């Protein structure tokens, strides 16, 4: 993307001139964690980084948005069992986000937008939205490139609403962005069909439950990547960029409905 929207490319003098209270500082959140046998560890990082860059490149000038580097390590303890998963404890991640919030608050900007590429961060980041609002007076926003299936997002029919991790959607986007890192010969359907029979205790149900990704299948993914395609990934990626653009426009004029 054009370096003009990268916050780190500004000098201290330029930052003071370019940023205002209505500027949006965008922080993408990635992850380095197991994604089954067919996807790379950096899947969430690749997606969060690419979609955030594309959105800020397209809508940054209009919305006065500035991009921070993508945070690679986040709260991935549901995958702690798998070698290669690099995760921060909830306490550490809260401290990191608090520190970043403090630094943003020291600039003229008073709005921070988190673009979260890892569903396991969602609950923690929703809490930090309010903490940063209370502690630093920032306007805080949490967006997702694609809403996780266990949080109300879409899922392929073959996934029974449980394309939670490494399923058709995520695999398709990676086939679009980094096909060289995807091994479709290892893609298999892994869906905990018994949960689909439950009324309340299930992904996205009224009753949440704690889980680790290997509670279900040894491969570590939950979904059906066998139907993934680069074409679907391209359409999903473009849709995510446009959706984030709408969000950025609304954030740029947000004032609690007053």
Cite the ranges covered by each PLM segment.
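Extended, histidine- and acidic-residue-enriched regions that form the cofactor-binding/catalytic faces
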Residues: 1-111, 119-258
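Conserved SAM-binding loop
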Residues: 114
